[in-house]
């Protein structure tokens, strides 16, 4: 039995179209389906999903808690002592659409968050004396910093889970 000459190319074309229209969202990801660059659908649950081949593409964003390790910065305390403060933060993407529209990707988000966190650390720790920064009141200062950063991060579709001072040197 002879197979028609057009059957094999037709099967290949259909296979490519089916392959291009399916995508899998892993449990650790959330996805935004874009049509010509405009967001059309937000997918937060894991599973097999469909899109229009060659017209729509998919951007995957992490659902997990992500780490941000800031570069050490100099902070001048209220008693004019200079400190080198090294801070870390943990954050997660809570609004994928707002995140995609405001920052676009994780690299830009990290840069913006780093700037926001550094300014809030300087603002809050700059009003405190060195003895206060080294005492148990430091957890209160971190809570103030976290709340301040969270209000700004909400506009980026991000939630700050934790802000900590990893190291503070004179």
Name each region found by the language model.
Residues 2, 39-40, 114:
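Membrane-proximal alpha-helical signals and transmembrane carboxylates
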Residues 24-36:
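Membrane-proximal juxtamembrane linkers immediately C-terminal to transmembrane helices
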Residues 35-67:
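Short extracytoplasmic
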Residues 39-41, 75, 96-99, 130-131, ...:
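Short beta-strands and strand-coil junctions in structured, solvent-facing domains, enriched
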Residues 63-78, 103, 143-147:
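N-terminal post-signal-peptidase region of extra-cytosolic proteins
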Residues 47-60, 100, 105-123, 127:
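Flexible, solvent-exposed short loops/turns enriched in glycine
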Residues 79, 85, 91, 109-170:
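Amphipathic, coiled-coil-like alpha-helical scaffolding segments used for oligomerization/assembly
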Residues 2-22:
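Single-pass alpha-helical transmembrane signal-anchor segments
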